[in-house]
Protein backbone atom coordinates (compact mmCIF):
# COMPACT_ATOMS: atom_id res chain seq x y z
CA UNK A 1 0.00 0.00 0.00
CA UNK A 2 1.28 3.47 -0.89
CA UNK A 3 2.21 5.84 1.91
CA UNK A 4 -0.40 8.63 2.41
CA UNK A 5 0.71 11.88 0.75
CA UNK A 6 -1.90 14.28 2.17
CA UNK A 7 -2.46 15.06 5.85
CA UNK A 8 -6.00 16.26 6.64
CA UNK A 9 -6.38 17.93 10.04
CA UNK A 10 -9.91 18.22 11.46
CA UNK A 11 -11.83 18.65 14.70
CA UNK A 12 -13.75 15.43 15.48
CA UNK A 13 -15.99 17.21 18.02
CA UNK A 14 -17.24 19.94 15.65
CA UNK A 15 -21.02 20.32 15.77
CA UNK A 16 -23.70 21.35 13.32
CA UNK A 17 -25.18 20.12 10.06
CA UNK A 18 -22.08 20.93 7.99
CA UNK A 19 -19.78 19.09 10.41
CA UNK A 20 -22.07 16.04 10.30
CA UNK A 21 -21.99 15.99 6.49
CA UNK A 22 -18.21 16.34 6.64
CA UNK A 23 -17.84 13.30 8.91
CA UNK A 24 -19.90 11.22 6.48
CA UNK A 25 -17.80 12.51 3.57
CA UNK A 26 -14.57 11.43 5.29
CA UNK A 27 -15.46 7.82 4.57
CA UNK A 28 -15.25 8.53 0.83
CA UNK A 29 -11.63 9.69 0.91
CA UNK A 30 -8.91 7.72 -0.91
CA UNK A 31 -6.13 5.85 0.87
CA UNK A 32 -3.53 8.53 0.13
CA UNK A 33 -5.07 10.79 2.81
CA UNK A 34 -4.07 10.53 6.46
CA UNK A 35 -6.76 11.79 8.85
CA UNK A 36 -5.42 13.66 11.87
CA UNK A 37 -7.84 14.61 14.65
CA UNK A 38 -7.29 17.65 16.84
CA UNK A 39 -7.33 16.91 20.55
CA UNK A 40 -7.81 20.36 22.12
CA UNK A 41 -8.03 24.06 21.17
CA UNK A 42 -4.66 25.05 19.70
CA UNK A 43 -3.53 21.47 19.02
CA UNK A 44 -3.75 21.89 15.23
CA UNK A 45 -0.48 23.86 15.25
CA UNK A 46 1.57 21.03 16.71
CA UNK A 47 -0.18 18.43 14.56
CA UNK A 48 0.59 20.41 11.38
CA UNK A 49 4.25 20.80 12.33
CA UNK A 50 4.51 17.07 13.11
CA UNK A 51 2.86 16.16 9.80
CA UNK A 52 5.52 18.11 7.90
CA UNK A 53 8.24 16.48 9.99
CA UNK A 54 6.72 13.11 9.06
CA UNK A 55 7.18 13.92 5.39
CA UNK A 56 3.79 15.27 4.30
CA UNK A 57 4.00 18.14 1.82
CA UNK A 58 0.25 18.79 1.44
CA UNK A 59 -1.50 19.78 4.66
CA UNK A 60 -5.26 20.30 4.54
CA UNK A 61 -6.92 22.41 7.24
CA UNK A 62 -10.57 21.46 7.75
CA UNK A 63 -12.45 24.10 9.72
CA UNK A 64 -12.90 27.83 9.99
CA UNK A 65 -10.43 30.70 9.91
CA UNK A 66 -9.28 29.94 13.45
CA UNK A 67 -8.35 26.36 12.54
CA UNK A 68 -6.54 27.53 9.40
CA UNK A 69 -4.69 30.08 11.54
CA UNK A 70 -3.59 27.33 13.94
CA UNK A 71 -2.40 25.10 11.11
CA UNK A 72 -0.47 27.90 9.41
CA UNK A 73 1.18 28.83 12.71
CA UNK A 74 2.33 25.22 12.96
CA UNK A 75 3.66 25.31 9.40
CA UNK A 76 5.52 28.57 10.01
CA UNK A 77 7.57 27.27 12.94
CA UNK A 78 11.35 27.54 12.92
CA UNK A 79 11.79 23.82 12.18
CA UNK A 80 9.31 23.84 9.27
CA UNK A 81 10.20 24.91 5.73
CA UNK A 82 6.84 26.47 4.94
CA UNK A 83 7.83 27.31 1.36
CA UNK A 84 8.03 23.55 0.65
CA UNK A 85 4.48 22.88 1.85
CA UNK A 86 1.09 23.23 0.12
CA UNK A 87 -1.88 24.30 2.26
CA UNK A 88 -5.32 22.99 1.35
CA UNK A 89 -8.53 24.41 2.82
CA UNK A 90 -11.86 22.71 3.52
CA UNK A 91 -14.08 25.52 4.88
CA UNK A 92 -16.23 24.36 7.81
CA UNK A 93 -16.30 27.52 9.91
CA UNK A 94 -18.72 30.27 10.81
CA UNK A 95 -17.30 32.95 8.49
CA UNK A 96 -14.74 31.21 6.21
CA UNK A 97 -13.19 34.57 5.31
CA UNK A 98 -9.86 33.25 3.99
CA UNK A 99 -11.58 30.70 1.74
CA UNK A 100 -13.83 33.42 0.33
CA UNK A 101 -10.79 35.64 -0.24
CA UNK A 102 -9.12 33.03 -2.42
CA UNK A 103 -12.26 31.95 -4.26
CA UNK A 104 -12.35 28.50 -2.62
CA UNK A 105 -15.82 26.96 -2.73
CA UNK A 106 -17.74 26.62 0.53
CA UNK A 107 -18.89 23.21 -0.74
CA UNK A 108 -16.68 20.54 0.83
CA UNK A 109 -16.67 18.36 -2.29
CA UNK A 110 -15.74 21.26 -4.58
CA UNK A 111 -13.10 22.50 -2.13
CA UNK A 112 -11.63 18.98 -2.11
CA UNK A 113 -11.51 19.03 -5.91
CA UNK A 114 -9.40 22.19 -5.60
CA UNK A 115 -6.97 20.30 -3.35
CA UNK A 116 -6.76 17.40 -5.80
CA UNK A 117 -6.18 19.58 -8.88
CA UNK A 118 -3.06 21.07 -7.26
CA UNK A 119 -3.11 24.66 -8.52
CA UNK A 120 -1.46 27.00 -6.02
CA UNK A 121 -0.91 30.65 -5.21
CA UNK A 122 1.78 32.25 -3.06
CA UNK A 123 0.22 34.66 -0.57
CA UNK A 124 1.69 37.01 2.00
CA UNK A 125 1.97 35.93 5.61
CA UNK A 126 1.80 38.74 8.20
CA UNK A 127 3.92 38.19 11.32
CA UNK A 128 2.89 39.87 14.59
CA UNK A 129 4.52 40.30 17.99
CA UNK A 130 2.04 40.84 20.83
CA UNK A 131 1.40 40.21 24.50
CA UNK A 132 -0.22 37.03 25.84
CA UNK A 133 -0.90 35.65 29.31
CA UNK A 134 2.50 33.93 29.03
CA UNK A 135 4.32 37.14 28.05
CA UNK A 136 5.53 38.43 24.70
CA UNK A 137 4.80 36.09 21.78
CA UNK A 138 5.17 35.93 18.02
CA UNK A 139 2.69 34.39 15.60
CA UNK A 140 1.33 34.77 12.09
CA UNK A 141 -2.16 35.52 10.85
CA UNK A 142 -3.73 34.89 7.46
CA UNK A 143 -6.48 37.44 6.86
CA UNK A 144 -6.82 40.21 9.42
CA UNK A 145 -6.04 41.40 12.93
CA UNK A 146 -8.00 43.95 14.95
CA UNK A 147 -7.60 45.92 18.19
CA UNK A 148 -10.42 47.65 20.00
CA UNK A 149 -14.07 46.90 19.24
CA UNK A 150 -13.70 43.61 17.35
CA UNK A 151 -10.98 42.39 19.70
CA UNK A 152 -13.34 43.06 22.61
CA UNK A 153 -16.26 41.39 20.82
CA UNK A 154 -14.29 38.28 19.84
CA UNK A 155 -12.52 38.01 23.19
CA UNK A 156 -15.82 38.07 25.07
CA UNK A 157 -18.09 36.14 22.69
CA UNK A 158 -20.21 33.42 24.28
CA UNK A 159 -18.96 30.06 22.99
CA UNK A 160 -22.26 28.35 23.84
CA UNK A 161 -24.21 31.04 21.97
CA UNK A 162 -21.84 30.74 18.99
CA UNK A 163 -22.58 27.00 18.80
CA UNK A 164 -26.31 27.73 18.78
CA UNK A 165 -26.61 30.74 16.46
CA UNK A 166 -23.25 30.99 14.66
CA UNK A 167 -22.30 34.46 13.41
CA UNK A 168 -25.14 36.13 15.34
CA UNK A 169 -23.16 35.49 18.53
CA UNK A 170 -20.57 38.01 17.33
CA UNK A 171 -23.29 40.60 16.75
CA UNK A 172 -24.53 40.13 20.31
CA UNK A 173 -20.98 40.43 21.65
CA UNK A 174 -20.34 43.56 19.55
CA UNK A 175 -23.47 45.22 20.96
CA UNK A 176 -22.21 44.38 24.45
CA UNK A 177 -18.73 45.75 23.64
CA UNK A 178 -20.27 49.04 22.51
CA UNK A 179 -21.47 49.59 26.08
CA UNK A 180 -17.85 49.89 27.21
CA UNK A 181 -15.52 52.86 26.76
CA UNK A 182 -13.37 52.37 23.63
CA UNK A 183 -9.56 52.47 23.96
CA UNK A 184 -7.41 55.26 22.53
CA UNK A 185 -5.10 53.68 19.95
CA UNK A 186 -2.16 54.94 17.94
CA UNK A 187 -0.45 53.34 14.94
CA UNK A 188 3.04 54.14 13.65
CA UNK A 189 4.75 53.22 10.39
CA UNK A 190 7.67 54.57 8.38
CA UNK A 191 5.61 57.08 6.41
CA UNK A 192 3.28 58.32 9.15
CA UNK A 193 0.92 57.63 12.02
CA UNK A 194 -2.78 57.52 12.88
CA UNK A 195 -4.97 57.73 15.96
CA UNK A 196 -8.36 56.15 16.56
CA UNK A 197 -10.61 54.06 18.77
CA UNK A 198 -10.68 51.02 16.49
CA UNK A 199 -8.01 49.70 14.15
CA UNK A 200 -8.01 46.67 11.88
CA UNK A 201 -5.24 45.43 9.59
CA UNK A 202 -6.11 43.38 6.51
CA UNK A 203 -4.00 41.07 4.40
CA UNK A 204 -6.89 40.67 1.95
CA UNK A 205 -10.15 42.39 1.08
CA UNK A 206 -12.62 40.35 3.13
CA UNK A 207 -13.79 40.74 6.73
CA UNK A 208 -16.54 39.04 8.72
CA UNK A 209 -17.64 36.77 5.88
CA UNK A 210 -18.51 38.21 2.45
CA UNK A 211 -17.88 41.88 3.35
CA UNK A 212 -15.05 43.91 1.83
CA UNK A 213 -13.54 46.02 4.60
CA UNK A 214 -10.29 46.46 2.66
CA UNK A 215 -11.38 46.94 -0.99
CA UNK A 216 -7.88 47.73 -2.28
CA UNK A 217 -6.00 44.97 -0.45
CA UNK A 218 -4.15 42.26 -2.39
CA UNK A 219 -2.97 39.09 -0.63
CA UNK A 220 0.38 38.82 -2.41
CA UNK A 221 1.65 42.41 -2.85
CA UNK A 222 3.80 42.67 0.29
CA UNK A 223 1.48 45.31 1.78
CA UNK A 224 -1.10 45.44 4.56
CA UNK A 225 -4.15 47.71 4.64
CA UNK A 226 -4.83 49.57 7.90
CA UNK A 227 -8.41 50.72 8.52
CA UNK A 228 -8.88 53.33 11.27
CA UNK A 229 -12.08 54.59 12.89
CA UNK A 230 -11.25 57.77 14.85
CA UNK A 231 -14.37 57.43 17.02
CA UNK A 232 -16.47 54.43 18.05
CA UNK A 233 -20.07 54.58 19.22
CA UNK A 234 -23.36 52.88 18.33
CA UNK A 235 -24.32 55.39 15.64
CA UNK A 236 -20.92 55.36 13.95
CA UNK A 237 -20.70 51.56 13.95
CA UNK A 238 -24.24 51.25 12.56
CA UNK A 239 -23.41 53.68 9.75
CA UNK A 240 -20.07 51.96 9.10
CA UNK A 241 -21.83 48.58 8.86
CA UNK A 242 -24.30 49.98 6.31
CA UNK A 243 -21.45 51.49 4.28
CA UNK A 244 -19.57 48.17 4.36
CA UNK A 245 -22.67 46.23 3.29
CA UNK A 246 -22.92 48.57 0.30
CA UNK A 247 -19.23 48.11 -0.47
CA UNK A 248 -18.56 51.81 0.02
CA UNK A 249 -16.82 52.05 3.39
CA UNK A 250 -13.65 53.36 1.73
CA UNK A 251 -15.67 56.38 0.52
CA UNK A 252 -17.02 57.11 3.99
CA UNK A 253 -15.54 60.34 5.50
CA UNK A 254 -15.30 58.91 9.04
CA UNK A 255 -12.76 56.21 8.17
CA UNK A 256 -9.16 56.38 6.95
CA UNK A 257 -7.06 53.80 5.12
CA UNK A 258 -3.28 53.43 4.98
CA UNK A 259 -1.11 50.96 3.03
CA UNK A 260 1.93 49.75 4.98
CA UNK A 261 4.51 46.97 4.95
CA UNK A 262 5.05 47.07 8.71
CA UNK A 263 3.55 48.97 11.63
CA UNK A 264 3.16 49.24 15.39
CA UNK A 265 -0.16 49.68 17.21
CA UNK A 266 -0.13 50.92 20.79
CA UNK A 267 -2.82 51.60 23.38
CA UNK A 268 -3.93 50.57 26.87
CA UNK A 269 -2.13 47.29 27.69
CA UNK A 270 -5.40 45.47 28.43
CA UNK A 271 -6.80 46.17 24.93
CA UNK A 272 -7.95 42.85 23.45
CA UNK A 273 -6.74 41.72 20.03
CA UNK A 274 -8.36 39.28 17.60
CA UNK A 275 -6.68 37.59 14.65
CA UNK A 276 -8.69 35.67 12.05
CA UNK A 277 -11.73 35.70 14.33
CA UNK A 278 -10.07 34.37 17.50
CA UNK A 279 -8.76 36.17 20.58
CA UNK A 280 -4.95 36.05 20.54
CA UNK A 281 -3.66 38.55 23.13
CA UNK A 282 -3.31 42.23 23.93
CA UNK A 283 -1.45 45.35 22.79
CA UNK A 284 1.12 46.47 21.77
CA UNK A 285 1.38 44.97 18.27
CA UNK A 286 4.38 44.95 15.93
CA UNK A 287 3.42 43.67 12.48
CA UNK A 288 5.43 43.00 9.35
CA UNK A 289 4.79 41.16 6.08
CA UNK A 290 6.54 37.98 4.98
CA UNK A 291 5.88 38.39 1.27
CA UNK A 292 4.50 35.42 -0.69
CA UNK A 293 5.57 33.01 2.05
CA UNK A 294 2.52 30.70 2.08
CA UNK A 295 1.56 28.33 -0.77
CA UNK A 296 -2.22 27.79 -0.85
CA UNK A 297 -4.13 25.41 -3.11
CA UNK A 298 -6.70 27.50 -5.01
CA UNK A 299 -9.10 27.16 -7.96
CA UNK A 300 -7.38 27.19 -11.34
CA UNK A 301 -8.58 30.71 -12.18
CA UNK A 302 -6.95 32.11 -9.02
CA UNK A 303 -3.53 30.44 -9.31
CA UNK A 304 -0.27 32.39 -9.74
Regions flagged by a language model, labelled:
Residues 1-62, 69, 73, 303:
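ATP/NTP phosphate-donor binding region
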Residues 7-10, 38, 76-197:
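Catalytic core of DAGKc-family lipid kinases
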Residues 12, 62-64, 90-92, 203:
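Glycine-rich beta-strand-to-loop/alpha-helix junction loops that act as flexible
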Residues 146, 150, 200-213, 279:
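Glycine-rich phosphate/pyrophosphate-binding beta-alpha loops
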Residues 150-153, 195, 207-210, 234-237:
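Short acidic/glycine-rich loop or secondary-structure boundary segments that cap or lie
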Residues 161-168, 215-236:
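Gly/Ser/Thr-rich active-site loops/lids in small-molecule metabolic enzymes
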Residues 181-183, 195-197, 220-225, 259-261:
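A generic structural signal for short beta-strands and their flanking turns/coil linkers
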Residues 189-193, 218, 228-304:
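ATP/nucleoside-binding phosphotransfer catalytic cores, i.e., glycine-rich phosphate-binding loops
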Amino acid sequence: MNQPSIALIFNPTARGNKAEKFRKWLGELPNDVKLIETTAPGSASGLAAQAVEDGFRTIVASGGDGTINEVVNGLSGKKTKIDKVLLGILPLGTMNVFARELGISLSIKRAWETVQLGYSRKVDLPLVKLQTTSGAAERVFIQMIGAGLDGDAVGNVSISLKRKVGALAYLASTISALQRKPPKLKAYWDEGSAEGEWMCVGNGKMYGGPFKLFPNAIVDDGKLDLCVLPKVNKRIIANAAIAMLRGRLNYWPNVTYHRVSRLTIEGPPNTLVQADGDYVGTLPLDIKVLQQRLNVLVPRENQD
